[in-house]
Amino acid sequence: MVAQNSDKMRALALKLFEINAFKFGDFKMKVGINSPVYFDLRVIVSYPDVMQTVSDLLVEHIKDKQLSAKHVCGVPYTALPLATIVSVQQGTPMLVRRKEAKAYGTKKLVEGIFNAGDTCLIVEDVVTSGSSILDTVRDLQGEGIVVTDAVVVVDREQGGVANIAKHGVRMHSLFTLSFLLNTLHEAGRIEKSTVEAVAKYIAAVQINSDGTFVGGDKGDVVRANDLQRTKLTYENRANLAKSAVAKRLFNLIASKQTNLCLAADLTHADEILDVADKCGPYICLLKTHVDIVEDFSDKFIADLQALAQRHNFLLMEDRKFADIGNTVSLQYGKGIYKISSWADLVTAHTLPGRSILQGLKAGLGEGGAGKERGVFLLAEMSASGNLIDAKYKENSNKIATEGADVDFVAGVVCQSSDAFAFPGLLQLTPGVKIDEGVDQLGQQYQSPEHVVKERGADIGVVGRGILKASSPKQAAQTYRDRLWAAYQDRVAK
């Protein structure tokens, strides 16, 4: 492994975390179990500077280890661009191994000019069990090519080194998972508990090259992931958040001990201000629909912001943006409401795709520039008969967790814990009411305990259950207590 004290190595580790090349949560692996950490180095192709740094370090590593071969070959597919750059920098011819032979043309499995007896150095991005490297080794050996070494970017430390060595191939890694975790912890990016949770998982989940588990007890393996989103405390999750306002909200919830959002769906400014003042001590978030306020004014917003500061809660405008980027930017930053100037958070549909995030960022303008702002993306709805399906939810999750604009995403509005895995996002679940049921307009209500413990809600949204109560203040306190107790039960399991 390259000298771990290198500033360049540590800077790269932090950069990979920043661009979501690896993330924490609960991810399904190829071997059939869930992992608390996932590497997706495919994203580096969108960051030429990162590609260059990784390739430079690979070349340096090859020189340090005095590895020589007549060819280099990247394991398909993520390692192919890395192997290409290594080939160019070293002046070493490259071979391309296909995952499957073409059914037409030359039908070759290995492309390039080579002779039997030639040596080849394998390049790989991430190694778990080592099976992908061994598949490449077998195909190269089938062509008479000699393979003795492989260089990899990340070793997950789950048996890959030993598995590959059994087949006469030495593995040399730039990073180990342990080094990456320690670097993030030392830089204050993750908690010690996260490091320990992943270490526990790695110790329990050692994998043979055929995908079976060392020791054979899959039951212990399945139980090893302690980084499932719903198991973690708000404090632990705050450090994993990519969004500054999400981090702030996590910490606010933890310190104030409330995961209650009040939906202030009222039509007069004085009514909203009154309920915000009475219920403010018990909520983490006040959700508005400013377009239904009949006497909206700048003074109303100033008074609302003052109450938010006094009682320590954030403001969310439930605008549900859903237009093209340019229109969304205008709706967010312009008009009579100037939402970006005062709302800490907004909501948006993912129907327009990733452009919705770019439009919102563009709409920050002068009013919201330099302030912590974020969005909750709508992945599911509580209305019966809504048209959102599983594919839409899956694509919404991708928009929330992948790409260059994830730093603007604070959370997801949804009804189920499987809508997303990343613990740095918050799940906002509407339709909370002590008396479960469906209203005359199709809104479905569920109890505080059900939405938190069964549905995975991090924040429960209550509207009429508080607004229609004889004492909104007492009702808010009751909902706060029950939602918080449900959260405590959830993380205690």
Curated annotation (Swiss-Prot):
Segments for region (Domain linker): 208-233
Keywords: Decarboxylase, Glycosyltransferase, Lyase, Multifunctional enzyme, Pyrimidine biosynthesis, Transferase
EC number(s) recorded for this UniProt protein: 2.4.2.10, 4.1.1.23
GO molecular function annotation: orotate phosphoribosyltransferase activity; orotidine-5'-phosphate decarboxylase activity
Region ranges (OMPdecase): 234-493
Any one of the GO BP annotations: 'de novo' pyrimidine nucleobase biosynthetic process
Active-site residues, record numbering mapped to chain: K320
Region (OPRTase): 1-207
Catalytic reaction list: orotidine 5'-phosphate + diphosphate = orotate + 5-phospho-alpha-D-ribose 1-diphosphate; orotidine 5'-phosphate + H(+) = UMP + CO2
Domain of life of the organism encoding this protein: Eukaryota
Record carries keyword DNA damage: no
Pathway(s) where this gene product acts: Pyrimidine metabolism; UMP biosynthesis via de novo pathway; UMP from orotate: step 1/2; Pyrimidine metabolism; UMP biosynthesis via de novo pathway; UMP from orotate: step 2/2
A Pfam family the protein falls into: OMPdecase
Similarity field: In the N-terminal section; belongs to the purine/pyrimidine phosphoribosyltransferase family. In the C-terminal section; belongs to the OMP decarboxylase family.
NCBIfam families according to UniProt: pyrE, pyrF
PANTHER family: OROTATE PHOSPHORIBOSYLTRANSFERASE, URIDINE 5'-MONOPHOSPHATE SYNTHASE
Protein name: Uridine 5'-monophosphate synthase
